[in-house]
Amino acid sequence: MCNAYRIGRDTRSTPAVLPEGLLRDLSEDRLVRRTDRAPVYAGGSDLVTMRWGFERPGLGTVNNSREDKLDGPMWRKAFQERRCLVPATGYFEFTGPKGLKRTHLFARADGTWMWIAGIWEESSEHGPCFSMITTEPNATVLPYHDRMPVVLEPGEIDDFLAGRMRHFKPPAESLRVADAANPLLKRPRPVQEELF
């Protein structure tokens, strides 16, 4: 789930609990794929660049962590000590059989930033790495996938970063979903309406 997301475009919507101007350098639309380096907020006054995905022996790169597994040995220390926010303007999901998959882009209905709950750790090989936390889907996402990123509301950000938020639920706000070209292909197939 969620192997690619977008950043960029909207710089108006930094929640009041975060430093003013935090998103000023993210006005260019950009795709982030698993193992790419991307900006995250881990406290302080600026975004920092981290690699998307924890490396685990036998598992390779694990880019998402389930909220119901955060007390397990793979995630516990990062969840207790190193939380972060992943800014995104949308994320992608895929449905259908191999070779005929359809791509769907999920974004906030008002077009503003999503603040996705994350955790991070230091890797001797890759430097700082982050993972998104996932939860059960809300009604918008359920027809497409059985998990979704934890999208925090502005009022939840402080509690999450301070470690006071330990349980997650899908956001009540419905997200906008649209068909999209597959961003993981070198030359994405056009979306149907782009053909005419």
Please tell me what each predicted stretch does.
Residues M1-F196:
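Short linear sequence motif anchored by a di-proline
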